[in-house]
């Protein structure tokens, strides 16, 4: 039996795809990866800004104060895993950009 996808889940995924495909145009952010797996979970979308700093996009169907905690967790993870982020930048944008992170 196939699980039915709700329209809100579909809408969230469509929004994520649209943002990822147009991240640089909309926000000036270079897209790096979708569903970026980390120690305990995943970031919906991750990119890099004009200062070569990471930018995380999370797509939510509803408002929740938990989103702040999630953002703080991601910040803490990035601070503790700078080498992992640098490897992602090397893989997607090359060593020259990664050396500036």
Give a label for each model feature.
Residues 1-101:
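Charged, terminal alpha-helix-loop-beta segments
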């Amino acid at each position: 039996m196939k699980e039915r996808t709700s329209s809100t889940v579909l809408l969230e995924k469509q929004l994520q795809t649209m943002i990822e495909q147009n991240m640089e145009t909309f926000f000036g952010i270079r897209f790096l990866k979708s569903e970026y797996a980390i120690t305990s979970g995943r970031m919906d979308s991750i990119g890099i800004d004009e200062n070569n700093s990471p930018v995380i996009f999370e797509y939510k169907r509803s408002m929740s104060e938990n989103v702040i905690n999630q953002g703080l967790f991601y910040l803490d993870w990035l601070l503790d895993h700078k080498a992992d982020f640098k490897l992602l930048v090397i893989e997607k944008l090359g060593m020259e950009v990664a050396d500036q992170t």
